[in-house]
Amino acid sequence: MRISQLEGKAVALWGWAREGRAAYRALRQQLPAQPLTVFCNAEEARDVAALADPALQVQTEASAQALAAFEVVIKSPGISPYREEARAAAAQGARFIGGTALWFAEHAQPDGYVPGAICVTGTKGKSTTTALLAHLLRADGHRTALVGNIGQPLLEVLSPQPPPAYWAIELSSYQTGEVGRSGARPELALVLNLFPEHLDWHGSEAAYVRDKLALVTDGRPRIALLNAADPHLAQLQLPESEVRWFNHPDGWHLRGDVVYRGQQPIFDTANVPLPGEHNRRNLCAVLAAVEALGLDAAALAPAALTFRPLPNRLQWLGSVDGIAYVNDSISTTPHASLAALACFAQQRVALLVGGHDRGLDWQEFAAHMAQQAPLEIVTMGANGPRIHALLAPLAQSAGFGLHAADDLAHAMQLARSALGAQGGVLLLSPGAPSFGVYSDYVARGRHFAQLAGFDPAAISAIPGLGVQ
């Protein structure tokens, strides 16, 4: 559905965060007098009222009955379509779409494809991978947009002039299904990995996997680039797409620190500013994507040396009294915490884990701790007691210290004390969201920096957003 097709319909916006505001502005550009209703909370309602838009109404209760009064509801990504009120309204005929679907419909060519649209998703690593892809494309002289879930809603860049040659688009699991629903098809879709995540939004692990894979199953990209090492992806059949693989010995893959293409060594990643083997494997994915676009990936690989790492992602803040502080606040799954720990093997590490409890399974994390644990683990947050109870029977035999904290400040105090005069690495990689304590993972990362004695402004915005 294109924006012009909304004219004359009963249309509502559900959510007034950045995506909701971007949708409002996009609609007003094309439909300046279209009556609209915004569903938002009371605080946001005051912001909406300040717009003084006579064709804009506000409702603060998004009940099934209220939603069902509209033909089209443009919802923000964080609002699950599986919510009871959304399901009930949909059953009564309301159509729910998101800004991602509107953007793709606006850009689709007559054959359905969106030229230059490269969609990146995965449970972890998608922001860094998308930014690295944009970095390499720009290094090759191509005007490229870095947009989507990474921090710039697609509808904020609806029609930039001149248009970019490529769109590097990060999509969360909340957005991946929108591509297929738009009827449009991206030029390339890259899926990095799949682990259980966002189960409170999706309702189950099976639904999460289904919704995530909708990017390639329903979105039908011209090229689907998949991780051959991921069991969810290795079994996919995508007859309407050209399927390519990375992390496969016949394609782009990593051996030690060296990127190979088949049997040919291409690039030594030892000096690339990307900590962790998982990031170097994702560099393989980026190079495979660049090659799939018809560009010289081998020649572009050295451009990765000038990539600027993203904040809150294994971000080294500095050292104080022999303790190095590393901010990995973006970590919201146990798998992400494990990947972070792997970057500091053989080092003295105090790991801070815990946060909002989304019901994720920490058994695999515990199994890893039984074999290869850091020196100290400090649990915190709503799911801290659950993680602590799981690890307590293992601590003595596996040889790690285990501590329970009331909050982040207390956790850092316990970690510093445990590391002692010998120092080491104090790693914030919570494996859980920040909800209930912080507005988002960025606020959590800034608080961590402040408590460590660093300027919270060091947790800066993601560089390179928008069209460059």
Curated annotation (Swiss-Prot):
One of its GO terms (molecular function) is ATP binding. InterPro entries: Folylpolyglutamate_synth_CS, Mur-like_cat_sf, Mur_ligase_C, Mur_ligase_C_dom_sf, Mur_ligase_cen, MurD, MurD2. GO terms for cellular component: cytoplasm. Pathway: Cell wall biogenesis; peptidoglycan biosynthesis. Keywords: ATP-binding, Cell cycle, Cell division, Cell shape, Cell wall biogenesis/degradation, Cytoplasm, Ligase, Nucleotide-binding, Peptidoglycan synthesis. SUPFAM superfamilies: MurD-like peptide ligases, catalytic domain, MurD-like peptide ligases, peptide-binding domain. The keyword ATP-binding applies. One of its GO terms (biological process) is peptidoglycan biosynthetic process. It comes from the Bacteria. It is found in: Cytoplasm. It catalyses: UDP-N-acetyl-alpha-D-muramoyl-L-alanine + L-glutamate + ATP = UDP-N-acetyl-alpha-D-muramoyl-L-alanyl-L-glutamate + ADP + phosphate + H(+). ATP binds at G122, T123, K124, G125, K126, S127, T128. Its EC number is 6.3.2.53. Belongs to the MurCDEF family. MurD2 subfamily. Cell wall formation. Catalyzes the addition of L-glutamate to the nucleotide precursor UDP-N-acetylmuramoyl-L-alanine. This is UDP-N-acetylmuramoyl-L-alanine--L-glutamate ligase. It comes from Xanthomonas campestris pv. campestris (strain ATCC 33913 / DSM 3586 / NCPPB 528 / LMG 568 / P 25).
